């Protein structure tokens, strides 16, 4: 696949979840409203001429890390799902850090005035608050900050969706008995895998906590996400859709020959800094 395919109180959600004090620095991106102007069901305006740009950075091969077989299936499934939702998809495979930074810069400098929002996908290895390009690691901050309101004016007040599938070398979580008495064990999220989320208002960060077993059709997380986007992407509020994805993945046990993965559980996470409800309704 070729590269480049195609006034009153400040809402608390406008402050990043990881550091609310630091979040005040992003005041230009916060949504200021009076209590009477924003109802509990206010939605993002999604009737612009374009849905928006979606970048997919797909890292299968690395200079000094093991490869990620199966990521091509994730890439292709996401491409189809996002195109079906009317996003303009551009795919970049096995890019070096300098190339990723260049593509990020180009997208941040583009005019998004007639777009509903923006999507960025990164499929790679990851650790803490970094992701790996072909040759070096890049911080999550470096791929989010260029799209904040102080730098990308045409995306102010618009949803910015980040999907991060970052494998951690096969680490999985032991299931524990559900305190609710259900048959299915709950999943314990490995705290070491929680990424720093240096985003701001109108961002939503969607990411896998740990590595799901890779099959020919890709990772558990991306499989489930694409399935839910295909079934409910145009009808279900986006955070509700992500909750369904969490449930799907958490109920799936690794079924492979690796005895260390038998009965293991995985669960993705999302952190929403959205200030309104998000529906990706069909374009007219």
Task: Specify the residue positions occupied by each region the protein language model found.
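Cysteine endopeptidase catalytic domains of the caspase/legumain-like
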Residues: 1-284
């Amino acid at each position: 696949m070729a590269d480049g395919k195609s006034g009153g109180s400040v809402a608390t959600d406008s402050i990043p979840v990881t550091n609310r004090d630091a979040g005040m620095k992003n005041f230009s991106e916060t949504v200021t409203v009076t209590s009477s102007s924003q109802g509990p069901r206010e939605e993002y305006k999604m009737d612009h001429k374009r849905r928006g740009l979606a970048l997919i950075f797909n890292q299968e091969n690395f200079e000094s890390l093991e490869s990620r077989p199966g990521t091509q299936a994730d890439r292709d499934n996401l491409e189809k799902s996002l195109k079906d939702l009317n996003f303009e998809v551009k795919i970049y495979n096995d890019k070096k850090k300098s190339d990723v930074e260049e593509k990020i810069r180009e997208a941040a400098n583009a005019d998004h005035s007639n777009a509903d929002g923006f999507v960025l996908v990164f499929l790679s290895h990851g650790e803490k608050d970094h992701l790996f390009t072909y040759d070096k690691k890049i911080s999550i901050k470096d791929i989010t900050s260029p799209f904040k309101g102080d730098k990308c004016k045409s995306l102010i007040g618009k949803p910015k969706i980040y999907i991060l599938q970052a494998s951690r070398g096969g680490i999985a979580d032991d299931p524990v008995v559900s305190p609710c008495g259900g048959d299915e064990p709950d999943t314990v999220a490995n705290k070491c895998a929680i990424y720093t989320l240096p985003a701001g208002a109108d961002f939503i960060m969607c990411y896998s906590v740990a590595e799901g077993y890779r099959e020919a059709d890709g990772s558990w997380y991306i499989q489930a996400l694409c399935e839910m986007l295909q079934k409910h992407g145009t009808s279900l509020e986006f955070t509700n859709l992500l909750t369904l994805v969490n449930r799907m993945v958490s109920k799936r046990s690794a079924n492979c020959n690796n005895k260390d993965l038998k009965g293991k559980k995985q669960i993705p996470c999302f952190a929403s800094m959205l200030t309104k409800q998000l529906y990706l309704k069909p374009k007219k």
